Curated annotation (Swiss-Prot):
GO terms for molecular function: 3-dehydroquinate synthase activity; metal ion binding; nucleotide binding. Its EC number is 4.2.3.4. It comes from Shewanella frigidimarina (strain NCIMB 400). This is 3-dehydroquinate synthase. The keyword rRNA processing does not apply. Zn(2+) binds at residues 183, 246, 263. GO terms for cellular component: cytoplasm. Binds 1 divalent metal cation per subunit. Can use either Co(2+) or Zn(2+). Its cofactor is Co(2+); Zn(2+); NAD(+). Belongs to the sugar phosphate cyclases superfamily. Dehydroquinate synthase family.
């Protein structure tokens, strides 16, 4: 088992990475002994893993469970209320713990519920998708969607620990694995050119779910994320770089309907649009754009936006993006493989050119 620490003073917490961790009763006992715990999962993950995690936790905690419908379209205030209702009906107190068993949707909703319930209770992330293991479970971003924008209602609220059981990836559908790889590739583009090159050389190993390759990639991403969050927890500076591709990507998700495109698929297309924007601004060379496109395609990810989306469909959502300041759209753009920056002077005319060329 590998362990990575997110350094946030008295709110620091560990990320555990390994196989069969969901059966590790001693690991759960560190956080749940003599406590009441509510497991939040969905109707896809629960049949696969709920029973074993209940067995691991039952030796140390009193357990209740709430099962949500699976999908991004259910990440809303209505379904968040299911969690609150369960907590209230079973008299959960401030010393209780929420346990998120699922992908990014379950993790985001559980974390937000923990932040809100009785003004804050503890929660643990047990991410089951590649995307949630390498990105959304780490760093304390919690939220639900609104029809007018993704993740618009939420809070920064850190978990007590993140428990990554890599065995879960054996049951992950191929398109969900690919979606997670979009976030993995992102780390190479914004932060680590050597890691990007390693990804280019290990496509087959990763797609065939080779344990050593997966463990290395997951640990590398978690370490980068932990380092970034330690520097900038609430996204006032360097953490914004983790949003590469997300301004375009969130527009795709909102316009197409949440869940029609997986988050990682939208981030993939959005990352390519960001790279093409950087090329138009003479910030990024053509070879780097091509490398980004090839690597996304190697993992069966889309590199173009939906045909039905033109400039007007993009821009109405981009103007509502959380990174907008002073009425200006701020974009994370790569300047070379391994480096990126935030730009607030990208004109809508140039964005129109980029989107129209896709």
């Amino acid at each position: 088992m590998q362990q990575i620490q997110v350094q946030l003073g008295d709110r620091s917490y560990p990320i555990y990475i390994g196989q069969d961790l969901m059966n590790d009763s001693e690991l759960f006992a560190r956080y749940l002994t003599n406590k009441k715990a509510l497991i939040v999962s969905n109707d896809t993950i629960a049949p696969l893993y709920l029973q074993q995690i209940q067995q691991a936790m039952s030796a140390c905690a009193r357990i209740e469970t709430v099962i949500l419908p699976d999908g991004e379209k259910f990440k809303d205030l209505q379904h968040l209320d299911y969690i609150f209702t369960e907590l209230l009906e079973h008299n959960f107190a401030r010393d209780s713990v929420l346990v998120a068993l699922g992908g990014g949707v379950v993790g985001d909703m559980t974390g937000f519920a923990a932040a809100c319930y009785q003004r804050g209770i503890e929660f643990i992330q047990v991410p089951t998708t590649l995307l949630s293991q390498v990105d959304s479970s780490v760093g304390g971003k919690t939220a639900v969607n609104h029809p007018l924008g993704k993740n618009m209602i939420g809070a920064f609220y850190q978990p007590k620990s993140v428990i990554i059981d890599t065995f879960c990836l054996q049951t992950l559908p191929a398109n969900e694995f690919a979606a997670g790889m979009a976030e993995v590739i992102k780390y190479g583009i914004i932060w680590d050119a050597d890691f990007f090159q390693w990804l280019e050389a290990n496509v087959d190993a990763l797609k065939s779910l080779q344990t050593d390759a997966l463990n290395y990639a997951i640990a590398k991403c978690c370490q980068i994320k932990a380092d970034v969050v330690a520097q900038d927890e609430t996204e006032q500076g360097v953490r914004a770089l983790l949003n590469l591709g997300h301004t375009f990507g969130h527009a795709i998700e909102a316009e197409m309907g949440y869940g029609v495109w997986l988050h990682g698929e939208a981030v993939s297309a959005g990352t390519v649009l960001a790279a093409q924007t950087a090329y138009k601004l003479n910030l990024l060379d053509e070879q780097s754009v091509e490398r980004i496109c090839r690597l996304m395609q190697a993992f069966d990810l889309p590199i173009t936006a939906p045909e039905s989306m033109g400039f007007e469909q993009f821009i109405k959502h981009m103007r509502r993006d959380k990174k907008v300041l002073g009425g200006k759209i701020r974009l994370v753009l790569p300047t070379e493989i391994g480096k990126a920056d935030v730009f607030s002077d990208v004109s809508e005319d140039l964005l129109k050119q980029v989107i129209s060329c896709v």
